[in-house]
Design a protein with these regions (language model features):
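Metal-dependent nuclease catalytic core centered on acidic motifs
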Residues: 1-70, 91-171
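Acidic (E/D-rich), amphipathic helical modules within compact regulatory domains
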Residues: 74-77
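Conserved catalytic cores of phosphodiester-cleaving nucleases, focusing on short active-site segments
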Residues: 79, 84-92
Length: 171
């Protein structure tokens, strides 16, 4: 049995239905768990110009199918759910430096989700980049400013690193 009760799904449906069409495009609602995706009408115009938008949108659908209530606001961040801001990164990075840059870019959000394909290789590269960025920020405790890092692997979001566990990796 799942954790999705009738009341939770109905509450989610009311939240989704309350979004005004002049501000939000209602992209998807999952009747089985109450997960949904809604995109700000202005984000749709800007986002079409960005690379990786298809992966970002499909990732939001995966998360909604896992019961997440996803709002995609105009501008930054890429998404808002679970009371936090999220930045999506496609894992087409060639080296550790490009991954570190992606992590620094994602610092505007509470969390980063790397959308990965080849699980072990890419996760190891992301871990190296995180370790490197922690090392660069360690002396002045600035590493605490780093966002928590997750990976989206085969339809599941998994924690990779978070501040509470500091120097240990979740995967």
């Amino acid at each position: 049995m799942n954790d999705y009760t009738y009341n939770n799904i109905e509450s989610s449906r009311r939240e989704y239905d309350a979004l005004t069409p002049s501000e939000w495009r209602k992209d998807y609602f999952n009747d089985d768990n109450g997960g949904f995706v809604a995109t700000h009408v202005l984000k749709g115009k800007d986002a079409l110009k960005r690379e990786g938008i298809a992966k970002e949108v499909s990732s939001c659908l995966v998360l909604a199918n896992n019961g997440k209530r996803i709002l995609r606001p105009k501008g930054y961040p890429d998404a808002y759910f679970d009371g936090q801001t999220w930045d999506f990164k496609t894992s087409t990075f060639k080296n550790e430096d490009s991954l570190r840059h992606a992590i620094k870019d994602g610092m505007k959000a509470d969390n980063i989700i790397f959308i990965v394909n080849s699980i072990e290789l890419e996760i190891e590269m992301i871990k190296k980049a995180i370790k490197s960025e922690i090392g660069r920020r360690k002396k002045d405790e600035a590493w605490m400013e780093l966002p928590d890092v997750y990976v989206l692997v085969q339809g599941e979001i998994k924690a990779l690193w978070n501040k509470k566990k500091a120097e240990s990796f979740c995967l």
